[in-house]
């Protein structure tokens, strides 16, 4: 069995048995995929352990692509391992980060993964904690109603968008299978879908790359998160947030 759900932001209440009773019939051979903004690796130290250990005790294997609200510095410290023909960061034995540009073979189906998204809650800037005026700027923003800012390497990371090498890895992976997969798992959507949503959405390098994938690849379903809604865009593209849906 394979299920997919959307952004968690470190809140995993949906995986309690009262909310996800289907897990009673699942084993570690079954998989639940989170479409980004996992948030379980946030502090990068022992403060994450209680939550991660609880996730490891769940009866299924939990995997996720990265979103734009992840501690990338901490994620990158985990060992890279091979899993079902692709590369993962192994957070716990059965809690895995599906890295970008990979194709995983799960239950006889190909899954292409390309996590990440551009943050749009940074209109008031990204603060540098080592800057001499950091405290002054932070105090000013804290006094501003509904200020939208982040702090570099504390609440925002440049790695939220893929590197040149990750784009190249994605192209190599897709070339190797003739751009034919069964499922695509991303955090944000292709440009044509992203622009259908909020006025804050705009095209960027990642959404444009995903638009190319949409136009070139052959696939059955594309599941993504980021936009905090549960919605079928059309017969192939599914936006997920709190819902947990079975796909296999």
How should each PLM-predicted stretch be described?
Residues 5, 11-106, 199, 203-211, ...:
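Core catalytic region of metal-dependent phosphoesterases/phosphodiesterases
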Residues 8-9, 38-39, 68-71, 117-118, ...:
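Catalytic metal-binding/acid-base residues of hydrolase active sites
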Residues 2-4, 33-34, 184, 223:
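Residue-level marker for buried hydrophobic side chains located in beta-strands
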Residues 93, 107-200:
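Active-site-proximal loop/helix segment associated with metal-binding centers of metalloenzymes
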Residues 158-248:
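Internal alpha/beta domain cores that form substrate/cofactor-binding pockets in large enzymes
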Residues 1-4, 8-14, 134, 147:
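Acidic, histidine-bearing metal-coordination/catalytic regions of metal-dependent phosphoesterases
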């Amino acid at each position: 069995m394979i299920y997919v759900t959307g952004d968690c932001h470190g809140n995993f209440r949906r995986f309690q048995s009262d909310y996800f009773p289907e897990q009673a019939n699942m084993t570690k051979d079954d998989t639940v995929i989170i479409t980004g903004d996992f948030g379980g690796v946030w502090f990068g130290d022992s403060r994450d352990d209680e939550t991660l250990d609880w996730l490891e005790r769940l009866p299924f294997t939990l995997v996720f692509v990265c979103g734009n609200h992840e501690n990338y510095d901490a994620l990158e410290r985990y060992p890279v391992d091979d899993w079902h023909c692709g590369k993962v960061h192994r957070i716990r034995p059965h809690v895995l980060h599906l890295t970008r540009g990979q194709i995983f073979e799960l239950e006889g189906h190909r899954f292409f993964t390309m996590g990440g998204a551009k943050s749009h809650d940074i209109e008031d800037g990204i603060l540098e904690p080592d800057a001499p005026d950091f405290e002054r700027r932070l105090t000013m923003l804290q006094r501003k109603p509904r200020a939208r800012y982040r702090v570099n390497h504390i609440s925002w990371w440049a790695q939220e968008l893929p590197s040149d090498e990750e784009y190249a890895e994605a192209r190599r992976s897709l070339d190797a299978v003739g751009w034919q997969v069964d499922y695509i798992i991303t955090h944000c959507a292709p440009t044509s879908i992203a622009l259908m949503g909020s006025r804050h959405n705009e095209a960027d390098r990642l959404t444009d790359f995903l638009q190319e994938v949409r136009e070139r690849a052959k696939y059955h379903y594309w599941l993504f998160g980021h936009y905090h809604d549960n919605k079928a865009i059309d017969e192939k593209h599914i936006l997920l947030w709190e819902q947990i849906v079975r796909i296999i």
